[in-house]
Amino acid sequence: MRNPLFFAMLLPMFLLSTSKTPPIVVPLETVKSLPSLYFSDCSSTGEWGANYKESILEILKDDIDASFHLDLTMGKIDIEPLVSGPMKNPSKELAAFSSDFVLLPKFEGKTLIVKLYEPRFHQTHLIGKVDLGGTLVEDRQKIHQIFDLVHKKIFHQEGIASTRILFCKKTEDIEGDWISDIYEVQQDGHNLKKITSSQNYLITPIMIPNSKKGEGYDYVFVSYEKGQPKIFKGNSLSPSSTPLLSLRGNQLLPALSLRGDK
């Protein structure tokens, strides 16, 4: 056992060293502010009814919220007339002009025109024009594509609002055997569509990147059609599919490069 005198001598030295050495503080950024986006109200023009226009703008708002990349503020006035000419001092005091970006939607006839205004530079950019058909199921995808263009303008990177999700749903046939088919749904959970009609067991569907042509795209999946699991390739607009590889044995869990070339 050490002599108590030994500890008594060490204690003043320890207290002296701690009093001279300040604590080390490492600041960590735990909250990163998002770019602010002011969603301008738009005048009640255009050929569509108020309810339909509200539904269209609600889809656009939901895409902004679902991106988790923007701090959204919904406006109650139409900002576009204020930014179309020289900026007046009273206008600068509005909340919209303290935002990083102002979204300017506008209906003209059957078309939705979307612009993006940057208060810092007093610049307005045309994002795109959407010819609406009056069917929300079809127009929804067009609005998703418009938001992806907004996302690219702000962040210089494609958004994912217009992407689709593939999944398999397992069911029991009349003989009690389990089968499954591949379904498609938009990223917001709408427009569910069955894209295969097999009497087999299908699993792990993956969309092939950069294969989209019009409304169609290629995808790969695993099928137990031939007994052993094999990787097949299909197209969303065609009911048929073909084996992707001629290798023997089990083929499971296909993976693709980001470009879809490997």
Describe the predicted segments one by one:
Residues 79-80, 186-203, 234-252:
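Multi-bladed beta-propeller domains
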Residues 138, 153-159, 199-222, 241-243, ...:
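Conserved beta-propeller blade repeats
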Residues 106, 166-176, 209-211, 219-226, ...:
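Beta-strand C-termini and the immediately following turn/loop, strongest in propeller blades
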Residues 18-35, 123-194:
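C-terminal/domain-edge helix-coil "capping" segments
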Residues 111-113, 174-183, 227-233:
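Structural motif
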Residues 48-61, 65-109:
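Short, solvent-exposed, polar/charged sequence segments at loop or secondary-structure edges
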Residues 17-63:
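A structural "domain/chain start" motif
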Residues 85-146:
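Amphipathic beta-strand/beta-sheet edge segments enriched in Tyr/Trp
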